[in-house]
Each structure stands twice: as structure tokens, then as C-alpha cells.
């Protein structure tokens, strides 16, 4: 900022600066000044154009404006003993020219200052062309495959890459070519970054880590320069691993989207393709990339010879979750009463990051409660916090809202018990959690299922609408409390019609991208509406058939606010595992199983 201050002072001096004598001089009339000259009071005079500065013998300074055409005054001054000095006046044209250049210079200085700041400090524009990757040298990436649990299939696929980095000559002698690139795809939190670090740690090679967004900049050519710099560093450090996280920010499909950054992004992708073509597997540089959205990647990036191997990293199954929990429990004081197998059973769909967060939340709750170790109550409370959007809020709802919430959650619980097959009801509560006034929680009791039939999807749709149906059945009207249920029901109906081919009228077509035109969109919209309406009728029929159970469950919720699964089954007089199946109307209006 020093040069800013200097520029400001210079501008002030140019605009407002004056000689010190002029700042102290007192103006005097021309006629009075002539009298002072004739009285020999003036000792010195300096004439600058029409301006005269006079130093009097008594030490004062006066300034006089000379009349036009006054040529005899210098002779008069010398005649009465005054010394005269002539000063050439400043050129006003040159001064105006200087003022004209000052604003552009100030603007240019501001741009340079802003560029230095956005480029990361003292490096300036040169910093933008440097590799954004962080280098982990051998030994710094202390993670190994032993620290990665629940991903046995993916680890087995990566083992030959590790062997190649350790003993490349064995593969070269056989004429085998190791994959140049490995793409890890899967939902967030499943361990893609951890796998890449473990790969480098296991092989004992340097590890370059960067994010796809690090290569994208405002200035044209910066992304391509950074890609070149990264691969230049990698070649010098070979054998090594280059890891690019969130590669969809860097290698998104070309030709999609518009705007000023499109050309820059395409230049960056082209440079990545050139670099991956420019080295062979013998150099020992292996590119590992991770993404949550492989569908948006450019096809040229995915072709063989670039990313040869595509590995899907899914959320772990029950056995994998138990292994992940065991890894995260190593550094925690976990009570013997906490069975990790039971925690794994209660957490279907959880990723590795979710499980780590669950145990950390339980540890925080144990510290808050003053416990010496993490017990089952803390784990159960942490699970409730994670699944229901936070701890119970200390909000006392109005009596009418509590009644409506009780019937709403009782409807969900009763429909879930009737329709969910082997799933187990964990709890139902009307204590406010997150943004809702209550929630109902089910968990898979047996093996997890990955393929769902049309009947499964329709039953789930019916359960989502059962809370709203219970409000309408008992209280006569619905409320805004079903907004989240409606959002999820709409999404499920859309999947059934446009992706899964579960509508008899639309048929086995995938209309996700609506390539069939407006008529197909209209028919799909009509099919979705019919499906949701049928599910709502089915939910109402189910609750009408078990109206007494609905009333008992709602009354118990109003009294106790929270009921565990076994308590609900006892209240409804169900034997453990019994499911009161009810035949309901399907989306076409006929009766029967779906």
C-alpha cells in the first residue's frame, strides 16, 4: 500500500501545491504598491507573468497582480533600489497533459494491486501459472489400505496398481500396461479421497493432491498452464500418483453451457487430454480422479488410454459398516456394552463419513454428560440427532399443533408397520426435531435390499402420504406439515413413471430427459398425478380399516411424546415381527397385490 500513499501525495502536490512564500504573501493593490516602491520600501521583486511577489525591507511579503501591458515597472523598481528577478511561468498545456495521464495510471495501479491479491500475494500473475497441487512426499501420506475398511472389492482392484509401482519391471517383462488413469465415482463421503491417499501410502511413492476447481481461473489460459505445471512436476517425481478430486469441475462435458468461461474450461480439458496422452505407463505416473457425478464428464476423458479403470465406491453394506465403525472406534473410549454390529444394523445407507460423524457425536455427548466412556445411550442419541436433523428443540407447540402432529406421525407409523415387510419400527415421536414437529424412524431388520418392485415403491408412496391422510381422516383437513412428505412423494412418483417404467400407460420407457416432446411430458405428468392420487386413496383406506389403532397410537403420543418400536407393537397388540398387511387399491384403480 506504500505506493498508493505516494501517488496520493503526488496528486495532491500537483493539484494544490504552491511555493511557501506565496502561501504567506499578503495581496496589495497596484497603486499602493507603486507608492511603496517610490518610498523605497521594496527590496526585492520576482515577476512571473502577470504576478509579482515583493519582499519589503521590513520582512513582509506582498503579492501584486500587474495590469496588462505594464512594461516600465521593472525599470521603476531598479530606479528606486529594488532587485528584480524574472521567472518563466509554467506551461499550462504541459500541466494539463500531466493531469490527463494521472487517472489512467491510478486505475492501472488499482488493477495490478487487485490482481496481486487474487493471485495469492507476492507471486503476482506468475502464481496463476504454478501447479495448485500439494505434494505429499514418501512417508507424509501415512494412510495405508489397512486404514480403509468396508471397501474390499475396490481395494482388491487397486492392489495391482500398488504392485506395479513397487515392482514395475515384473509387469514390463510380461508386456502388461498398467492403467494410466483410475476414476473413483460414488456418493460423497464414501472414502474416495482416503482410497487415493492409501494407494500412495501403500506403494511408497509421492502423492500430488489437487481439486478440479483449482485449475479454473478468470484469466484465459491459466487452467491449461496449471495442468502443464502439474504434470511437469509429476514426471520429475515419477513414479508417483496424481490425485484430482472433484474432477467434474475440471473435465465437464464440452459444448454444454455458455458464458465467458466456457472457452477457458475447454482449453483446460484439452490440455488435460494432451497431458494424459503425452506420457506412457512406463513413466510411472498414475492419475487417480474422484467424482460424485460421472455422468457429466466429457467422453474423451473416460475413453481407454486415459481413465482405463472405472471403480464405483458405494456406501458400505452391513459388514462394511461394522468394519468402518471398528476403525473409527480405535481412538475412542467405547463401552463394552456398545455392539458395533447392532450400530451397523441400525445405519443402512450410511457412508464412512456418516459413521465417523456418528461416533464423534456420541463422544461429544459423553463428554457433555460427564461420562468416562461412550455408552449405548450416547450412541442412540447421536443416531437420533444424525437421522432426524438435530437434537429435540425446546419448543412448546400449540395444543392444536401437537394433536395434528400426533395423528400425522401415528399415520406414518401405522402405514409403515402395515406395508414395510421386514423393516422394524425404531421410534415415533412428536418432539420437534430440525424443521419438523416430529418424525417416525424405521430400520431394515434383515438384509438390505437394492432392487425394489413396483409394489415396494407404491407402498412407500402410500406410507409417505399416510400422515396427510390421517390428518384429513380425523381432523377434516390437511396442513402444511406434510410439505416434506409431498416433496419426497412427488420425486418417487417421478422416478416410477419416467425412469423405472412402472406405469402401465407410459410403458417401459425412460423419459428422464423428455426427448419425446411435449406430449410425452403431458402424459407423464398425468401418470404421476394418478399414481399419487391412488396412493393417497390407499393410505386413507388403510387408516380407516385400523382407525382404533390410529386413535390409540395418537393418544399415547400426546401423553408420552415419544414411543419406541416395541412399545408401539405392544400398544397395537402385535406380536414381534407381525405385519398387518392390507390389500389396497393400485394406481389403476383395481384391487389386488401390486
UniProtKB/Swiss-Prot annotation:
**Segments on the Cytoplasmic side according to the record's topology features:** 1-2, 114-594
Q: Which UniProt keywords apply?
A: ATP-binding, Cell membrane, Hydrolase, Membrane, Metal-binding, Metalloprotease, Nucleotide-binding, Protease, Transmembrane, Transmembrane helix, Zinc
Residues annotated as the enzyme's active site? 409
What's the superkingdom here?
Bacteria
Cellular component GO terms held in the UniProt record: plasma membrane
- Entry's NCBIfam families? FtsH_fam (TIGR01241)
The protein's name in its UniProt record: ATP-dependent zinc metalloprotease FtsH 1
Species of provenance: Symbiobacterium thermophilum (strain DSM 24528 / JCM 14929 / IAM 14863 / T)
